[in-house]
Amino acid sequence: MGFLSYFRSQKKRSASVAKERLQIIVARERSQTATGPDYLPMLKEELLDVIRKYVQVDRDAVNFQLDREGDCEVLELNITLPDQQDQAAAHDRG
């Protein structure tokens, strides 16, 4: 019986090692998604380009915020639009 218990104890050790490794992988994935997906900077630039096709806004007038709500991530986009008069003057100049 001592011989069999030796192998059983290794299974417990390998299970705990596997559990630790899985926890490390999960923690690493969570830390990477905490800063946002890899495509987020490019998405921001493309959205800014689309907005600028219709409204002349400064880069500082557009605010992007990535929030996590439970299992979902929400990309919030806030744009400070220029006044109608400012937009008309810019359109007349351009």
From Swiss-Prot:
GO terms under biological process: cell division; regulation of division septum assembly
UniProt signal peptide: none
Lineage: superkingdom: Bacteria
Record keywords: Cell cycle, Cell division
Pfam families the UniProt entry points to: MinE
InterPro entries in UniProt: MinE, MinE_sf
Intrachain S-S bonds: none
Stretches of the chain forming a coiled coil according to its record: none
Gene3D superfamilies, A to Z: Cell division topological specificity factor MinE
Similarity section: Belongs to the MinE family.
HAMAP family on file: MinE (MF_00262)
Role this protein plays: Prevents the cell division inhibition by proteins MinC and MinD at internal division sites while permitting inhibition at polar sites. This ensures cell division at the proper site by restricting the formation of a division septum at the midpoint of the long axis of the cell.
Protein known as: Cell division topological specificity factor
Organism from which the protein derives: Alkalilimnicola ehrlichii (strain ATCC BAA-1101 / DSM 17681 / MLHE-1)
Gene that encodes the chain: minE
